[in-house]
Amino acid sequence: MSAITSNLTHHFLIAMPNMADPNFVRSLTYIAEHNEQGALGIIVNRPIDMTLAALFERIDVPLEADGLAGQPVYFGGPVQTDRGFVLHRPAGEWHSTLVVNDEVGLTSSRDILQAVGSSGEPPEVLVTLGYAGWTAGQLEQEIADNSWLTVPADLAIVFGLPPEERLAAAMQMLGIDFANLSESAGHA
């Protein structure tokens, strides 16, 4: 394994069955940034008991775009759970956006929510409260400890499948069924 495992930006992390942290059990995490300082991602398969309509009302942003009111808000991770993050396609230009690549961005500024509420743009969004973060070397160590599987991200899984199907779909990209994974793992 290389010093940085390879850059995992725009990859999925699939929690292994031995994951001890309850925040990540059976989670699928999209990595928006990974570099020598650490990593930042959002869990994309954990809807919480809140809809976009409720969130928009809570932050006093009108939600006029059709079809969005009933969409769930997600638990994005255990860091800054009082703050919203929007994974969206296309990346666009917003006040506070981490541009992952030409196709996708992660934004934490209010202007994107105002645009979503008024026009439904950008057309593909996943809104979370909180994010997942790792310090320098932490994610690499967790991967070495067999806490995670990694696979290049497929945004069709995030934006095109119901949350309960996303983990299995990501695992199918690796040719693996979650039920066949062991809770103990080793290195050959």
Swiss-Prot record:
Signal peptide: none annotated. GO terms for cellular component: cytosol. SUPFAM superfamilies: VC0467-like (SSF143456). InterPro entries: AlgH-like. Gene3D superfamilies: VC0467-like. Transmembrane segments: none annotated. Pfam families: DUF179. Belongs to the UPF0301 (AlgH) family. This is UPF0301 protein AZOSEA09490. The lineage of its organism: Bacteria, Pseudomonadati, Pseudomonadota, Betaproteobacteria, Rhodocyclales.
